[in-house]
C-alpha cells in the first residue's frame, strides 16, 4: 500500500491543479447510475485520505460529505475534489452530518478515542459504518459498538483490510485444514521506526482552525502537552493506544484469525516500556504482549527503535525470520510467514517453500457490496471480529499500565517459567542493548498478569480490582458512550 507523507499532501493541497497523487483528478468521482451509495468521510488526515482514495474509485459510490474538527484540514480535502468540490458538503460537527437524510454511510478515520462513539452515533442515525482500527479506545466501548450494530441492524465493517485479501483467506483455510499440523505459536510483529515526539516545557497552542471540544470528544479537554496535536495523539494513552493498537492491531488480528479463537484469551501479560528517549509520549515503543489461548500462545512484539543506531534503508529495523511488520505462524510441520498485507508463504520444517498465497485489497468494495445485499455474514471485517482484536491490544496496554519496572536480571528470573515470553523478551533486551538503552533508567515494565473470565469480558484473580476500571474510561459529557442492549 502507498502511504503518502503529510508533507507531500500539504504541498499538493496548496496547488489544487498540481500533477501529484493528491491532485483534484485523483479524487474525481467515478460515474455511477441512479441508486449510488452516498458516503461521508469523517476524519481527513492520514487514513481518511486513504478512505477517499478508495471510495472515489468505486463504481456506484459517491462521496457527498466531509467532516473534520480542523477547518483547515476540511478545506484542503474539499479542494482536492476540483470541479466536483461544489457538490461536497462539509461539516465540523459529526452530529450535524448524521442528521442529513441524503447520506447512506459514514467512513470513520478520526483518532482512536473517537471511533466507537462516532460509530455508535452513526448506527443510531441509521447509517452504515466503515470504522478504522482499532474500533475502540477501550474494551467496554467496543462491545457497545457491537451491540449498536445489532440493535440498529447496521452494516459495520472494521478497517482490518488484511482480511479481505484472497491470499490470506486461502492461507488461513489451508492451515486450518491441517496441512502443517497444529499451530504451536501465532506471532505478530510491528518493528516500525518511531522517533521521539519531542518534549515541551509547557502548554502548547491549539491551532485556531481546530474545534478543540469536538476534537477531544470523550477525552479530557486538557492543555496540549506535546508539539503536534495531530497524529502524535497515538502515543498518549488518553487518546491513543500506542503502536500495538495502531499498526499492530492488523498483525494481532491476523494471528488470532489463524488461531481461530473467537474470544479473549485466558491470560494476558505485557513486558515493555517507552525507551531510548524521553519525550511527551507515554505509550510503549518497545513491547512484548503474550495472550495465552487454549489452542496456542499469541505473541506480539513492538519495536520502535532501529536495529542499531544509525541503521537505514532495508536494514533499518530488526527482522524476525525476514519479517519486520507481519506474522509468523509456527506449526508442527512448518510455518506460514506474511511480510505484507496480502501475500503469505508456507514452508516445511526444513525451510522449503511448499505453497504461496497471493491476493489484493477488496475491503472497501466488500463493505459496499454488503451494504447493497444486507448480508452481514459476508463482511470480511465484521465489527465483532474488529472488537475482539482491538480488545487484545487494550489488554496488553492494561497489563503494562498496572506493571512496575524491573531490572533485566529480575525480569529474566520472573519470565523463565514462560518459555515463549522468556524467548521474546530476551530478544527484546538484546535489541535494546544494541541501541545503548540503559535499562535502569527507566527500567522495563513487567506488566501484571491478567486473568480473563471465561465469559463477559471481565477480569478475575489477583489484579481484577485494579484492572477492571481500565476496561472503560471516564467520559466527558456530552461525549458519553452509554450501555446498549441489542
Model region roles, listed by residue range:
Residues 1-131, 140-155:
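N-terminal glycine-/serine-/threonine-rich beta1-alpha1-beta2 phosphate-ribose binding loop
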Residues 39-42, 63-67, 107-108, 130-131, ...:
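Structural recognition of the beta-strand scaffold that forms the well-ordered cores
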Residues 128, 136-216:
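A contiguous active-site-proximal alpha/beta segment in oxidoreductase catalytic domains
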Residues 170, 182, 187-188, 196-242, ...:
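Contiguous beta-strand/loop segments that form the cofactor/metal-binding neighborhood of enzyme cores
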